[in-house]
């Protein structure tokens, strides 16, 4: 275990020596964020590992990253997929023998609680932005609902957490520029927590492989609305699934660089997922679910595929990947370091 950890640490150190913390410093203030190429991480907090009760199953089923948020930041990742839900812990007060419930916005992947919290991520990003004010962060979040958890307080807890960090959060507008976002965070939520967002809401998220830019999702902030073309086709377990995924990735890349699309939607945003899984298992569940090896096998195909298709200066949009910042995970060449480099270089 020590050798693996040391190897990973050396790999990250070598990467950050070339791709320092401040790659956005090279980007002009007036560049629109929607026209950038930004590396991102799918289920970003699984790199922290899982809480003790979820460690065994979580590592088998739900691991999509090797690096934690600080390490992802160090290699150049600037977009983070977060899945908070309410975690309840009951403790007994010794004086009254009464049980008290403590509620935390824990980051989950499915049923499994990672070792990071929603507030914890903001603390990491706040420190990173203070140390590197030329940079910015984008959070894409959703409520990771479960029948096994009481999420009834989720909306209020998310709103409170975002209000506590309101000095960092930028209101969404489709023509948002790098200069307007430097040193701050754009929070885009796929679930609502109040009538108007602190950042932006996304409606119409898609999971198919079609990539139809003429039927875009919508993004809206307090006063302005924009369009989004998203590719998040994630289940490659069927025959032909990998081919369909690769074609969808390439299709969105072409859409993001199409003159026709730019003419009709000059401020369209793009999110392209290389993430997904190829294998399922019933090792810990009654029904087949994704596995960490399935995520690795998919990443070995998709991360390399997209890295090879990024040529010169082009727009990739937000590229949400598994195993960002490392080229090897488990038994697979996941090419997450190579893809992060390619995305950054395309700016």
Question: Where are the language model's segments positioned?
Answer:
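Active-site groove signature of glycoside hydrolases
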Residues: 86, 133-148
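Aromatic-lined carbohydrate-binding surfaces of glycoside hydrolases
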Residues: 77, 82-90, 147
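Long, acidic (Asp/Glu-rich), low-complexity accessory segments flanking structured domains
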Residues: 17-75, 88-131, 136, 195-200, ...
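Aromatic-lined glycan-binding groove of carbohydrate-active enzymes
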Residues: 184-288
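Acidic, His- and aromatic-enriched active-site or binding-groove loops in soluble protein domains
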Residues: 114, 118, 158-174
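Fungal secretory targeting signals
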Residues: 1-17
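Loop/turn elements at helix/coil->beta-strand transitions in domains of secreted/extracellular proteins
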Residues: 75-80, 132-138, 182-184, 265-267, ...
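Conserved, mostly hydrophobic/aromatic
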Residues: 72, 83, 139, 187, ...
């Amino acid at each position: 275990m020590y050798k693996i950890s040391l190897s990973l640490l050396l790999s990250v150190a070598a990467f950050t020596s070339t791709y320092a913390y401040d790659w956005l410093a090279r980007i002009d203030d007036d560049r629109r964020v929607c026209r950038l190429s930004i590396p991102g991480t799918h289920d970003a907090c699984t790199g922290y590992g899982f809480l003790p009760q979820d460690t065994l199953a979580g590592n088998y089923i739900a691991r999509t990253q090797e690096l934690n948020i600080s390490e992802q930041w160090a290699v150049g990742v600037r977009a983070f997929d977060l899945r908070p839900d309410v975690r309840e812990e009951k403790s007994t007060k010794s004086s009254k023998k009464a049980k008290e419930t403590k509620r935390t916005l824990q980051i989950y992947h499915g049923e499994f609680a990672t070792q990071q919290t929603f507030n914890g991520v903001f603390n990491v990003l706040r420190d990173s932005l203070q140390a590197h004010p030329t940079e910015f962060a984008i959070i894409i979040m959703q409520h990771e609902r479960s029948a096994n958890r009481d999420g009834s307080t989720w909306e209020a807890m998310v709103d409170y957490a975002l209000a506590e960090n309101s000095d960092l959060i930028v209101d969404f507008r489709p023509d948002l520029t790098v200069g307007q976002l430097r040193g701050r965070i754009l929070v885009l939520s796929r679930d609502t927590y109040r009538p108007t967002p602190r950042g932006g809401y996304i409606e119409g998220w898609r999971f198919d492989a079609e990539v139809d830019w003429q039927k875009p999702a919508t993004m809206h902030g307090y006063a302005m609305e924009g369009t989004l073309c998203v590719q998040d086709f994630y289940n490659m377990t069927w025959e032909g699934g990998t081919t369909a995924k690769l074609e969808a990735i390439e299709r969105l890349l072409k859409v993001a660089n199409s003159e026709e699309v730019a003419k009709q939607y000059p401020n369209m945003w793009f999110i392209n997922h290389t993430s997904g899984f190829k294998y399922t298992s019933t090792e810990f569940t009654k029904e087949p679910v994704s596995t960490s090896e399935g995520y690795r096998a998919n990443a070995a195909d998709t991360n390399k595929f997209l890295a090879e298709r990024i040529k010169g200066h082009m727009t990739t949009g937000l590229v949400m990947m598994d195993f960002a910042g490392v080229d090897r995970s488990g038994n697979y060449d996941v090419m997450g370091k190579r893809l992060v480099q390619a995305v950054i270089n395309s700016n």
